[in-house]
Design a protein with these regions (language model features):
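N-linked glycosylation sequons
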Residues: 1-165
Length: 165
């Protein structure tokens, strides 16, 4: 009698999951937002991971874990995209300090260098929007690779401006 032994299936591995929480991730994409799409795509990875760190990449990164991936599910689902920008580099560094494991980044930007995994979300399109508002102050952000025109109305006056990338 001959027995054939299959290679054992690959076991899930520990994981550092960095999720972009910048304002651009709140952009509509299909029936939800880019962040919703990112959550949907990375949730299976997180749920299977025996140990994970989840890092919200906002202006100041915020980490959860290390913990079993399934224990971080609610934290992932509760993430919001509201920061003016996401500091992916700082978020990746924080995750690596907390857990020595492959890093997967979910973002609507290009793949960051030096990570083991990338989950890209969002259609490639020009993105112009308000990134900060205060009394007497308005900041516009341009995610395109070229200057874009904008029109802003303040106190009944209309201003046309060119917003650099």
């Amino acid at each position: 009698m001959v027995l054939a032994l299959e290679d054992p299936p690959l076991a899930p591995s520990p994981l550092v999951l960095v999720v972009d929480a910048s304002a651009s991730m709140a952009a509509r994409e299909g029936k939800g937002t880019r962040l919703d799409l990112a959550k949907e795509r990375v949730l299976p990875l997180l749920e299977r991971s025996p140990e994970a760190v989840l890092v919200r990449a906002g202006e100041r990164p915020e980490a959860f874990g290390p913990a079993p991936g399934i224990a971080l599910k609610e934290r992932l689902l509760a993430l919001e995209a509201k920061d003016r920008k996401g500091d992916l580099e700082a978020a990746i560094a924080l995750g690596r300090r907390l857990l020595k494991a492959p890093v997967v980044v979910a973002t609507d930007g290009p793949p960051p260098p030096g990570v083991e995994g990338y989950v890209g979300v969002g259609s490639p399109r020009e993105n112009l929007g308000i990134v900060a508002v205060a009394a007497g102050f308005l900041a516009l952000g341009n995610g395109a690779g070229r200057p874009l025109p904008a029109q802003v109305e303040v106190g009944g006056k209309t201003f046309r401006v060119e917003v650099p990338p």
